[in-house]
Amino acid sequence: MNKVILAIAFLLSFSCIGKSSHCHAQNKLYDEQLLKKIKPIAPTSASLGRYGDHPVDLSTGQVPIEIPLYEIKSGDLSVPIKLKYHSGGIKLNQEASWVGLGWNLDFGGSVVRTVNGFPDEKENPEVPDVEKVLEEMDNDPKGDNCYDKYNLWNKAKDYQCSFRPDLFCYNIGNLSGSFFLINDSIVTTASVPIVGCINNNTQRLVSPDGNVYIFNASETTTISSSHVKMPPYTSTYYISSIISPNGTDTIRYNYQNSGEYSTRTGTTYQGVSIINRVIIRRAPEESEWKPQQEILPIPLTGNDIYVGSVKTVKPQYIFFRGGRITFNLSERKDLATVSGNITCKKLDNIVIERKTSNKYETVKKIEFHYSYFGETLTDSDAPQKLRLCLDSITEYGKGDDELYTLRLIASFDYYGKKQLPDKNAYSVDYWGYYNGNKSSDNIPKTDLQTYKYAKVGSADRTPNEALMKYGSIKSMTYPTKGKTEFLWEINRVGLANHLYESPYVRDNCI
């Protein structure tokens, strides 16, 4: 039976469109939602029977899209393996993960690090933290130590220090959240009590239920440019073992090198020089001399190129009581490989095996089928033009009759699959989504006028609702031939009787 599921769920601001008698109540509701602090949402496991259930989060407008693939059960421990899709839109310079653009594979846990300024553990020890800097400035109102403070800010500018700690976002079990490391102690940003420590590039987190998560597999990132002196740092920590509260059950992870890829991000800049001068000119209708101000545009001086490289790892085996899971990889074309290193890989299949005696027997095999967003004529320009696209997932394994069968888990369609331009194109809006406007730089077009008129920049960064959805998922088809269609539109926010557009993609309908 063919069935199409189309459930409409508008954002809060759209509730005001309709009868005017409803506007004030909806606006009040929106104000309350706006003032609430958005907390991390614990991911939930879905079942195959609930594929079509995709409720819209009313605070973010996003949709949880998850596809369960397998669940590891080892004594008191259980780990779901599932695909998750981020429904916040696809930015033009966004790279695809090892399972396709917009998708991520959850296989047990990870800690992703956002470096604020300079890596915490590699900061200049002579530089005080931000609290000490502020205290010193408060105690020196006359500025007697200006030279020392000038040197301090110069070190911050050169990335020898930072005035904010790095942010760590974790995903373990059914919990997600974030924390900071302050004096080697974890300070969480949510009410979920997570206990942990970091030592010799290993993180140890303990969840409220007592499970211990050890992270000592990692990815390393390096960033450099003419203005940045950033040493290599650990950007992602991957789970290496999960231990039950009583210590009787353990799930272990082995990792494989999945290549090193490079990224190039260019920025252009243009300034103006505001010159105050007295023009020796008498206004014809006035008797006094008038000082005038002149604005002189400074020509573009070129791009500042930020070059980054990421050394990646991916799971090879997961060992648990009574079996193991194997992850098989193959080469991909859409990531630029660092010279002399292994080509980056994508996930080809997952093999679930049962241990009998001293041998492993295949129970099922999950295959991932890909193509690419964009088009290219040569392999040399593939890293700039292509993005890995997940088309479908199939499963080969034993059915209820103990016979091996092949079945579809899900297939996907996307908006504008062949229309996305180069990753570094300037055709983006203020938030980085594709808008189709061609430009020679990414500086927003701005008109300045005092005594003389000047223009700065040439880019039209206006959002385009039709084009910003390019690359986002359009529909998902299930084994029953049922289908869920996803309709996306620009996010809008409203206060009182005004409605404002916020130019980035969020979901409108499912």
Tell me the role of every PLM-derived stretch:
Residues Q26-S240, S244-G247, A283-E286, Q292-S309, ...:
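Long, intrinsically disordered, low-complexity, charged/polar and glycine-rich segments
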Residues I350-K359, F368:
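Long hydrophobic segments that form regular secondary structure
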Residues M1-N27:
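Bacterial Sec-dependent N-terminal signal peptides
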Residues V228-T265, Q270-I274:
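Long, hydrophobic, well-ordered secondary-structure blocks that form the structural core
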Residues S207-G210, S244-T250, Q256-S258, F320-G323, ...:
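Acidic, low-complexity segments
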Residues T202-L205, S240-I242, K314-I318, D348-V351, ...:
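Beta-strand elements of repeat-based all-beta scaffolds
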Residues I67, I81, I214-E219, M230-Y233, ...:
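Aromatic-rich beta-strand edge motifs centered on tyrosine
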